[in-house]
Amino acid sequence: MKIKIIVILSFVFIQSCGVFNRIPSSQNNACDILDHRSSWKRAVNYTNKKWGVSPALQLAFIKTESNFRARAKTPRKFFLGILPTGRISSAYGYAQALDGTWDWYKKDSGNRNASRTDFSDSSDFIGWYVDQTNKKIKISKSDVYRQYLAYHQGHAGYKSGRYK
């Protein structure tokens, strides 16, 4: 009897993992996403209060960068078109943050245990990065287009006009 209970509880636990990591089916409707993901709603609202970055901007960045996939990675590079040689970059997670930028965020924000696969941490990262962009490059936090260009290209890439 005890083994049956353990097996059943293990099965329920494993199945529930899939429920919590499932990609939202209606990715083009922010209200639907947040209605079905209360923890995501709390995260984007907290980031809005902390960094002054709108939930709409956060969700737009995450949708564009990872399609709401926690473990999103960049495509592989291939040698001679067939032998995989690594990834295009170290971008990973919801926010597709690069290793160096993520390390900078963890050190600067004090969030040393942050994980790129955690939605709340990714939301906070985006808020922090937009705040950094506002301070360093003077792009308004409400200028979603220019903020995204700076996010995607990096501060140096944006300043050099690499996006043009």
What are these regions (language model features)?
Residues 8-10, 112:
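A periodicity- and composition-biased signal for non-globular, repetitive helical segments
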